[in-house]
Amino acid sequence: MSWPSLSGVPNGSSSVSTWLSVTHPRRSLPKELLTAFDTCNVAPEALLVLRSTSLMILEETCVVVGAAEMPTAEDNSGRELFIGSNGDPMERKTRTAHHAIKKTVRIKKGHRTTFAMTVANGAYVKFGARPLTEANVLVVRKWIVKLIADEYKDLRVCDQALVIDRATFLSFIPTMAWNNYKFIFHGKNAVTDRVAGENLFSRIAQWANPGKXGCPVVVTGQGCVISRAPDCAQLRVKRLLGVTKNRTCMRVSGVSPNIQIIPFNNDITTLERAIKERVFFVKNLDKGSPTKFVSPPRPAPGVFAQRLSNTLGLLVPFLPSTAPMSHQQFVDSTPSRKRKVYQQALEDISCHGLNLETDSKVKVFVKYEKTDHTSKADPVPRVISPRDPKYNLALGRYLRPMEERIFKALGKLFGHRTVMKGMDTDVTARVIQEKWNMFNKPVAIGLDASRFDQHVSLEALEFEHSVYLKCVRRMVDKRKLGNILRHQLLNKCYGNTPDGAVSYTIEGTRMSGDMNTSLGNCVLMCMMIHAYGLHKSVNIQLANNGDDCVVFLEQSDLATFSEGLFEWFLEMGFNMAIEEPSYELEHIEFCQCRPVFDGVKYTMCRNPRTAIAKDSVYLKHVDQFVTYSSWLNAVGTGGLALAGGLPIFDAFYTCYKRNSNSHWFSGRKGRLKTLSSVDDSLPWFMRELGLKGKRSSAEPLPASRASFYLAWGVTPCEQLELEKYYKSFKLDTSTLLEEHLWQPRGVFPDED
């Protein structure tokens, strides 16, 4: 889809009344002959009166005529004719037996402008009074087009074209009530009184709260309530009298929405709940049952081999034939932040050898992450479960040579690139747009696999491992790899906290720290969805990033694809739910991002509310303000590389860079140094994609503002106000504020 441009509208118009020329007196207003251009030259006073009386006129005159079949006739030669709106017979060019006579709805002559005013009233209620800018016109016109398509789809095309153009511009004319209140609240006396009151309030607020806006605030981690899940025989919990150390992080005050981001502490109560509710139990979907928690569903024996055999047969010709890397090659290919760990593991293997029985044991702990406590009142903490680095080294040297090639094989299975790992925001959006354009009337649906790792059963792991073994060239290497993978089928786990310890053994399930977690999730999801598409005989495309999936298909196939999906995946051992269908490209949500048009091309854009809230949190305690400035510069640099030129984000990340006071961070080398210096504290997308991003700071274009509104519901006017706020905002990098002295305040327009 390409966004049209608006010509003839001067930039910087404060309101429509300053742009529309008053050329027609009210008494000579030719409503019957108005065109879209003429409507823009109507006196605002006349249109205000027309707006207030349009509903009454519509009701009295019945502007919209009821649908009726077109009258037909035949001429002397036997050709079928239909009677046009002007009463003249016209030939129907194509006519077959299965073509029905089309019904149409028209607007009575002389009332097109009145009907346009009714539509304009709806747009005015939706968007309110706003300046006439190109971005606002694009947003309003898009909304009116959708309204006409949904509510008046049988309206004649010529009437639709006239109504859309007229209603778009009529909706920008403010009502008399708006003008009256604008004078009351923005008159000279009103402004003087309000400024005096605001100054007094500002002085009182500064006296009561000495903390400066924009300074770092210490946020203390918290535990969670005791799990309501039942006790489990496999889980052994030992409580001690130790004192848990609170995790602390830092939040930039005054820049984000009012969303509570608080990490969980690694105490025994929190760890026990995480294990119970993310490993052993799931919530019972039967609301009427007295049992609130049940064991995760498990597939029937042989169901994977039976249902995925055809898909596996189609995939095998595309699978690579690989040989393992050497241990040193694997260490050298590891990201720098983990290279030291694996170099030490290699030295341990060289000295003491590899003991799979002990090295495959899993150490669990509560994940230190930015947890949203606003969208979920009682979120369940997540658990991290890595094995010994020596085990990961032994397995990784087999999997790394085949990983990217398996991703390409899965793309060939669907006929188009499918796995989106490692792609930057521009490439991801381009691939999604290509998939969208493959269908005549496309629809996209997200598939939500609830707690995917927990539902990866023993049968699923065995099937996944069989795919890896088909990629290994030599038989001796197949046996070695099979022996290493076998230790993932029965997991022995333990965890220690200052106030307790846990241990348990579980069959199957995905361990989040395994080398094949990402690859395995992609393999299982892609193959199951492909098999389900074959089962339903529906042509589909898939965008996948592990357990994040979006399926593209024709709208006519949506009902067929959706029916029975939950039951089919439940028999495979997964709780799979279908999210709301997306009929607009901007509504497709993939990995918490949506495609947004930047004026030239589409790019993936994160949710501004949650993204800015999380990007204002630094998962370390600030003991040196040089570190704080480095982090600000790193987030600003990575953010602009991914979202430069997009509404709100460009101003937000520029604000970080401007206030970082790190002038020595410049150029490619400085960028590398900045990101690596605080690498562990950056979001994953900035670590993985920040250096790949090619975007830079730029003023958002009108088409980008309109597309951003479609994606995230922030109007162009709200975008401009937020950007104005960030452009003038000054961060305080010299004062550390305690948490009890700071109250979170939202900066988005729809927040208190």
From Swiss-Prot:
GO biological process, one term: viral RNA genome replication
Record field: catalytic activity: RNA(n) + a ribonucleoside 5'-triphosphate = RNA(n+1) + diphosphate
Record's keyword terms, sorted: Nucleotide-binding, Nucleotidyltransferase, RNA suppression of termination, RNA-directed RNA polymerase, Transferase, Viral RNA replication
Annotated Pfam families: RdRP_3 (PF00998)
EC number: 2.7.7.48
Listed CDD domains: Tombusviridae_RdRp
InterPro entries: DNA/RNA_pol_sf, Rev_trsase/Diguanyl_cyclase, RNA-dir_pol_PSvirus, RNA_pol_HCV
Chain ranges of the RdRp catalytic domain: 442-561
One Gene Ontology molecular-function label: RNA binding
Family, per entry: Belongs to the tombusviridae RNA polymerase family.
Misc remark: Readthrough of the terminator UAG occurs at position 213.
Function: RNA-dependent RNA polymerase that plays an essential role in the virus replication.
Protein name per UniProt: RNA-directed RNA polymerase
Source organism: Oat chlorotic stunt virus (isolate United Kingdom) (OCSV)
